[in-house]
Every structure is written in C-alpha cells, then in structure tokens.
Amino acid sequence: MPDLSAIVKAYDIRGVVGDQLDEPTARALGAATARLVAGDDPAPSAVVVGRDMRDSSPALAAAFADGVTGQGLDVVDIGLASTDMLYYASGTLDLPGAMFTASHNPAAYNGIKLCRAGAVPVGQDSGLATIRDEAGRFLDSGVPGVPSPGAVRTEDMLTGYARYLRGLVDLTSLDASPELTVVVDAGNGMGGHTVPTVFDGLNVRVVPLYFELDGNFPNHEANPLDPANLVDLQKRVVAEGADLGLAFDGDADRCFAVDDRGEAVSPSAITGLVAARELARAHAAGESDVAVIHNLITSRAVPELVAEHGGRAVRTRVGHSFIKQTMAETGAVFGGEHSAHYYFRDFWKADSGMLAALHLLAALGEHRAAAAGATVSGLMAGYDRYAASGEINSTVDDQAARVAEIEGVFGPRDGVELDRLDGLTVSLPDGSWFNLRASNTEPLLRLNVEAADDAAVRALVDEVLAVVRA
C-alpha cells in the first residue's frame, strides 16, 4: 500500500505512478477530499476534476471521481486542462477542484493539485493533512459509501477560459501593429491544448513547437526553468526571425519568454512589466494604495518599478502559499515570483502563465505601434536592470552552521544590512545582495545573487561559495 506521507507534499500530492500513486489511492483521496469540502460553508454540490496529458492521468482522475461520487457529491469532468484552466473552472463555477498533473516532473510521476471553491489553494495547513490522514484510514479499512451517490457530468471550459483571459488584458494594440510572429514551445504539455484557442483571432502568427500532447516528453523536459530546456526555442526564434518566444511547463501554469535575439527574459523583468500594467489598470479604475507582491528572490528592480508606477511593493517569503496569503491580506492586484509564477487578483488570486503571456503580447503590440521596428529586447531593457546568478545549490552537512559563518563574514562590514525573512539576505552598500536559504527537503543551501553586472555577480558568488563549500 502506498505511503501517503511520502506523496502528500506541502502544497500538492505527487509521486511515482504504481509504486506511490495508484487507482485505489486516488479513489481514497477523492473520497477524503469530498468529505473535507462537504464541511465547507456553503457546502459544494460537486468537485471539478481536470487532467493533463500523462498516460496515467485518465485512470487516476476517473478513480478520484469515483471516490468523490461515492460520498454523494457530483463531479464536473472538464477533461484535458491546464492548471490555470482548472482554477478558472473552480472560480466561475464556485466549486472545489482537483487537477491531475505532476507539472514538470518526469513521465513516471503524477499528482493532484487541490483547491476549494473560488480557486482557494489547499495545502498541508488548510486541509491536505486531513485528506492524507482520512485517505490513509480508507485504504486500511475501506471507503464507506452513502445511500445516494453523486453523478459525473462533462463540461467544456476551454472556450470560456480563453474568453475570460482575453477579457482581462487590453489586446487592441495587436491590431494596430504589424502581425507578431511568436514561437511557442509547449514541451508536449498542456500549452499545446490551450494556446491555439487562447491565441485564436489575435494578430499573431504562432509557430508551434512540440504541441503534440505526450506525457513521455520525447523532446525535452517540460521545465523551462532549466536553461537546457529553452535551447530549442531559442534556436527556433532566431531561425524564424520571430518577435518573441514563449515556453510553458507541463501543466502550463508557468510561462517563460525568449526575446527576438534568442535570449531568455528574466521572470523578474516580466514581473515588473506586468506589475506596471496591472497598476495602470487599477489606477484607471480609481484605486489608490495598490499593492504588488513579490518574493524576496525577485530582482530589486521589481520594487523600484512598482514605486515608479505609483504602487506599493510588498515582499514575501519564497513559496506560492505566502504569495497568495499576502495577496488576500493586502488586496494586491498582482504578485510575481522568480520561478515564473504570476498571480492575478482578477483571476481569483491564482497564478496563470497564459495571462502573463497575454500581457507581454499586448505590451509588445503597444511598443511596436509607437515605434516601427520595436523589439521585445528593447521593450524589456527598462525592466531587466541588474545581473543575476540564478539559483545555485550546494550540498552541505550543517546548513545552519554555514549560514552562521556567512553572517559572521559579512555582518560586521560597514553598510551591510541583514534580514532573515527567509533564510539570510545580505544587502551590500553598492546595491548588490544575496540570499542564502536552506532547502526544506534536502541537505542543500540555495544561493541567489544580484549585482550591477555579470562580473560583480561572479565575484560575489565566488566569495560566498568559498565559505559555503569550504
């Protein structure tokens, strides 16, 4: 019997199919989820279930649905979906949801992302631990049924999802500028299912790359955070003379960009761009004191840009639960992470890489309408202000001791500022900074460095790693 404690993570359920996650386990998790949400006020009548393109997803989703209906709730089966399409369904139908996906993990994996009605995330401290424990009891002793089981009905949400997203972004600039050529790498993931419908009717020529749905990922991992997985897109953008490249991860909730030169665009720069646009939209609606959330690993250009556009930047720890919690507390219009998760107040505070992509297209259309021959690289130059290292992992035996050593080295220096919001962040007088934080699951320290230029980044990385890896 699978060990549920091994597959129920902080924010989702994820494991190797067969060994850790099988149909009886999915059925027990469905029953436990139904029991949890039945206690909500108001109690939902159904649970929305969506799935990605992995070979194991149809059977696991069907078993989960069987567990839900066995507890008297209906299931709304939306079929193949991106994770943000599941959030759209949860929000518009005001129902809890379950998305079967393992995102960018290898083909052997699958998982479940859960939310309550209105796309409110379910994590360990908000119901996932309860689901884990109850599902474990069901696996031990059987799942009790109810006299009147629920039913399954199917619903197509793709067209409504596309229409809703396009309604959140002013895309009229695309019609006022020459047709854009955009290469889209779906990585054989769900972007291949959603992009054609979302982009339909826009003044954009899409060059599709790996749109065939294939959960075995025959071309590359569906994880654009790894630079190796952007290489094909970068080459194709240059070969096509394209204006822009977009890359989606497996469940298409994250979107990365490549500019007209084939260079990767920093997610921090996209955060700054979208923040400026969402602030302008909020101000046009008469709002004041508008907040934007960013985690502490994003570039310091983000709070600078937020301030320049009349907003209030709020800094959080790394992790989507902190972003969503802070968005709820502040009423923030937008939130961004260095990992290319982008959260929108008008999208139930949930993340949507597709919505960020539409903002980027609209901004480029406006840029080109204002200046013939304008490019993404030119557009993003104002948002990508500093050099960054990316995340560098080091295996260490004693994480706390190494962090203390770093504090001892840098803390006494004149003009140095330290903070411990998440790990240790050290800000130097010249404006450079680094964050060192421990992994929660592995004996790793994660280092992120930002400075004025690449040479300064390399020098600071070398200085920190000389202590961390000594």
Where are these regions (language model features)?
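Gly/Ser/Thr-rich active-site loops/lids in small-molecule metabolic enzymes
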Residues: 203, 208-210, 263-282, 353-362
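N-terminal small/polar loop signature for handling phosphorylated ligands or for N-terminal nucleophile
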Residues: 39, 43-110, 166, 197-258
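Phosphate-binding and adjacent anionic-ligand microenvironments
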Residues: 284-470
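Proline/glycine-rich low-complexity loops and linkers
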Residues: 78, 129-163, 167, 260-338, ...
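An N-terminal, well-structured beta->alpha segment
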Residues: 1-64, 70-71, 151-180
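Gly/Ser/Thr-enriched, mixed-charge loops and adjacent short helices
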Residues: 110-240
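Short glycine-rich phosphate-binding loop at a beta-alpha junction
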Residues: 42-52, 76, 181-183, 290-296, ...
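Glycine-rich phosphate-binding loop
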Residues: 97-109, 114, 237-259, 263-264, ...
